[in-house]
Amino acid sequence: MPKKTIKIVVEGGNVKPGPPLGPTLSQLKLNVGEVVKKINEATAQFKGMTVPVTIDVDLDTKEFEISVGIPTTSSLLLKKAGAEAPSGDPAHKKIANVSLEDIIDVAITKKPSLTAKTLKAAVKSILGTARQIGLTVDKKD
């Protein structure tokens, strides 16, 4: 029972059957429309955010299983800030402000996938990401 795993990063609830996913699924002789529909259903709660998705395909039976990961840190931060995209020049152009509570909330959400051992270390990591995408925290850089 050979299996193939496909890992992709998609926009939540907005997957299209075109490249790069469509051709990959077609090579495995899967119904592309059905897979895309299931991915969109599974990622609907993360609409507008980039989300890692893993598709495990049984090559004999053509059955597939979809698992959705936690959205990227920058996507979670942008959603908290109400911003569309990160700053092209984060050192000089700030795009929004978030509270320290928002940073802690994102750190708690992402902690299982971070290498940080403590919540404090996770918060520092999230603060670094916030700075790199042009966010201020409690009106401070």
Curated annotation (Swiss-Prot):
Entry GO CC: large ribosomal subunit
Coiled coil: none
Keyword flag Ribonucleoprotein: yes
Biological process annotations from GO: translation
Keywords of the record: Ribonucleoprotein, Ribosomal protein, RNA-binding, rRNA-binding
Short name of any one Pfam family annotated for the protein: Ribosomal_L11_N
Keyword Transmembrane helix: no
Molecular-function GO terms, alphabetical: large ribosomal subunit rRNA binding; structural constituent of ribosome
InterPro entries according to UniProt: Ribosomal_uL11 (IPR000911), Ribosomal_uL11_C (IPR020783), Ribosomal_uL11_C_sf (IPR036769), Ribosomal_uL11_CS (IPR020785), Ribosomal_uL11_N (IPR020784), Ribosomal_uL11_N_sf (IPR036796)
Family according to the record: Belongs to the universal ribosomal protein uL11 family.
Main function: Forms part of the ribosomal stalk which helps the ribosome interact with GTP-bound translation factors.
Quaternary state and interactors: Part of the ribosomal stalk of the 50S ribosomal subunit. Interacts with L10 and the large rRNA to form the base of the stalk. L10 forms an elongated spine to which L12 dimers bind in a sequential fashion forming a multimeric L10(L12)X complex.
Protein name as it appears in the record: Large ribosomal subunit protein uL11
Species, as recorded: Acidianus ambivalens (Desulfurolobus ambivalens)
UniProt lineage: Archaea, Thermoproteota, Thermoprotei, Sulfolobales, Sulfolobaceae
Gene designation: rpl11
